[in-house]
Amino acid sequence: PNPALQQGAEGEDPAAQGPEPGTPQAVYTPPDVPKTKGTLTVGFGRFNPPHAGHGQLMDIAAGSARDSEEGSDYMIVPSKSEGKDTDPLDFGTKVEAMKGMFPHHSGHISEDENFRTIIDVLKYAHNQGYANARIVAGGKRVKQFDELSQKYNRALYDFGNLETISSGDRDEDGEGIEAMSATTARQAALDNDYDTFSSTLPTDEEGNDFAGEEDLF
């Protein structure tokens, strides 16, 4: 098995952190950027390792962009965090796996290593001229992302509408997508349990396994 995956359990999401200490707030206002675009929907997470459940988050982000006003788009942003028990895969390996697992979203998966937190992404969206922003997060992260993002609106970025929506709740006792988790995949690698690890990964439209799953394991 991939030695990197033979590590820890779930932890805090570094994506849901505020700006670096010392970032001015009261005296800082966002750059004055013409709002020429609609809504940017952002799916931000560790994706470490990526699994079938993440496809649901990406589909929701894509659907949100389609249903929004003209000039809207979506982006999937993997965090840069790596090297800890909960983040065993390096950034490049993670992005490559995500693009291979979800080819229909490949063009929307960011390779920018400067996006360390959701705040970085929202500042980018503001500077790109988006009038609104929407964050897609797992059920238990929604409140955390919403409170953090709202805290810095009008200070580090400026959106007329800023909201966080859920990609769904994970049911550890359930089956299918709702039961998928990166923790399960990491534990399967730790236990050298290839079958369970494989079951967490998506298949293509013909039901074929992800081509890179043996290398990822």
Regions found by a protein language model. Give the residues of each.
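Nucleotidyltransferase catalytic core that binds NTPs
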Residues: G18-F217
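Extended, compositionally simple fibrous regions characteristic of intermediate-filament-like scaffolds
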Residues: P1-A26
